[in-house]
A protein has these predicted regions:
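C-terminal accessory regions of radical SAM enzymes
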Residues: 4-13, 153-158, 162, 362-459
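Conserved C-terminal portion of the radical SAM core fold
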Residues: 47, 63-65, 91-93, 238-241, ...
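Glycine-rich beta-alpha loop elements in corrinoid/cobalamin-binding modules
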Residues: 30-169, 383-385, 389
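A general structural detector for well-ordered alpha-helical segments in enzyme core domains, enriched
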Residues: 27, 52-55, 75, 79-83, ...
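N-terminal [4Fe-4S]-dependent radical SAM core
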Residues: 4, 11-12, 151, 157-205
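Glycine- and acidic-residue-enriched helix-capping/strand-helix junction motifs
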Residues: 12-24
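Residue-level signal for the nucleotide or nucleotide-sugar donor/cofactor binding architecture
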Residues: 47, 121, 171, 232, ...
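Radical SAM [4Fe-4S] cluster-binding motif and immediate context
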Residues: 179-349, 369
């Protein structure tokens, strides 16, 4: 079957896409392995409804899979409308973070014109669904429950009823095909790694694990990939890195998984194998969890193998707010770890959010003061967004006394349901003040760097 895998056609709600979508790449590889003709299109690279219509008419895919983030619900609804107007007989399947975290009935009510949703990991489910559609036809008279009952994570409707199957996860990640890199080629994206000194080569995301045991109040990743961490073997990771390095000229890697450093032996083996293979690369990663494995010895090895930056998901500088978030690492530990990382030559980025449940101006000021006190190379602030499947989502349902949320009304910068004691307008005002402070700080750093460079030149 001919399949289009895509994101919704949308104007940039937050940041434009900087690098390939791993999820679509994994699904494309799975479909290709089953003999399907898969196409991946990132319409955020050129968000034109007219070009989308032309592509649909010229290629006429039989099935279209759309990856949906909560911030893109309205754009997805519009994209589905365009598909229905252009290709009436096409089967539409939605998947990704928002469907995975949403209640099945609420989800299908929000997307009345889609045929199916897949929750959780779809490498097995999507080909299974296509096989069922191909063999029996979408309008087959066979009872709905019998036709689809064995497809993990599937959600579908029949008349006024919505049916759903339990999510199933792949436990041996080495058995999953690498993403279909020829369809999500890193050379098509224009992005550079912060802290990088390499002047050549492309940048690519990669993951080494799935799942996260964390219970952060703002995160729904456990709804997609579970709480148990599943690991790829270091040899499997290096095999994919070598493919990207040798075939696609990738010299910079971003490890995107939540728990990259959770298995110390795997982390060390990956670093040692990079050195053994003599790969001239640079890489970074984000750490949302405990920092115990980032010791002096490990950080030294990481630096020698190419690690140039570590992004820390600190989120808040208020101990009170951190308890609400279910973060167990203390601010004292974080401050000490930042110094250890920097002492080993690795740059540090820090992510913070404002607007947590019942957070006041006092706690937000504690966060900003702590953030600006850290010796880090990058600071980034965002507003906490109540995603489905999170404790924050349950909190706003109780606070605002409703059972159904109009996700299409959500905007990543202006939620109609703020979770803190501040309104969306007040939170945005505070974020603007923080952004101005960041600009002044960055300008100061640039001036200092130029002065130091001039001093070295004239010595």
């Amino acid at each position: 079957m001919k399949i289009l895998l895509t994101v919704p056609v949308t104007s940039f709600v937050s940041d434009p896409p900087n690098f390939p979508d791993l999820g679509l790449g994994y699904i494309a590889a799975s479909l290709k392995n089953k003999g399907h003709e898969a196409h991946v299109r990132d319409w955020n690279m050129d968000p034109s409804h007219e070009k989308f219509k032309v592509w649909l008419m010229e290629n006429r895919p039989e099935v279209i899979g759309i990856k949906v983030f909560t911030k893109d619900v309205a754009a997805t609804q519009k994209t589905i409308t365009i598909i229905r107007e252009t290709l009436r007989g096409t089967t539409i399947v939605i998947g990704g973070p928002h469907p995975s975290a949403s209640e099945p009935t609420d989800l299908m009510n929000d997307f009345v014109d889609c045929d199916f949703a897949i929750r959780g990991e779809a490498e097995e489910s999507f080909p299974f669904l296509l096989s069922e559609i191909k063999n029996t036809g979408l309008k087959d008279a066979k009872p709905e429950k019998e036709r689809y009952k064995n497809i993990p994570g599937l959600v579908w409707r029949k008349g006024g009823d919505v049916f759903s199957n339990p999510i199933s996860l792949c436990h041996n990640l080495d058995n999953i095909d690498f993403p279909c890199w020829e369809m999500i080629n890193p050379k098509d994206y224009f992005f550079d790694m912060l802290g990088s000194t390499l002047k050549e080569g492309y940048i690519s995301p990669i993951i080494t694990t799935r799942g996260c045991p964390g219970k952060c109040c703002f995160c729904c990743v456990h709804k997609i990939s579970g709480r148990k961490i599943r690991y790829r073997s270091p040899s499997n990771v290096l095999k994919e890195m070598s493919l990207l390095y040798n075939k696609y000229n990738v010299k910079k890697f971003m490890f995107m998984d939540n728990c990259f450093t959770s298995h110390k032996e795997n982390l060390i083996k990956i670093c040692e194998d990079i050195l053994k293979e003599k790969m001239i690369i640079e890489w970074d990663f984000v750490s949302y969890e405990k920092l115990d494995n980032l010791t002096d010895a490990t950080l030294s090895l990481m630096y020698r193998s190419g690690c140039r930056m570590i992004h820390l998901g600190i989120e808040s500088g208020s101990e009170k707010t951190r308890k609400v978030m279910n973060k167990s690492t203390s601010l004292k530990e974080i401050t000490e770890k930042v110094k250890v990382i920097k002492d080993n030559g690795i740059k540090v980025g820090a992510f913070f959010m404002i607007g947590f449940p019942e957070e006041t101006i006092k706690e937000i000021r504690e966060t900003t003061n702590y953030a600006f006190s850290l010796d880090v190379d990058l600071l980034k602030f965002t507003i906490c967004f109540p995603l489905p499947g999170t404790q924050n989502y349950d909190y706003i349902k109780e606070k605002y006394k409703f059972s159904i949320i109009n996700w299409a009304s959500f905007n990543i910068k202006d939620s109609p349901y703020p979770v803190s004691q501040l309104s969306s307008k007040e939170l945005n005002r505070m974020l603007n003040v923080i952004s101005l402070r960041l600009c002044l700080l960055n300008a100061r750093k640039i001036v200092i760097r130029k002065i130091m460079k001039a001093v070295r030149i004239f010595k």
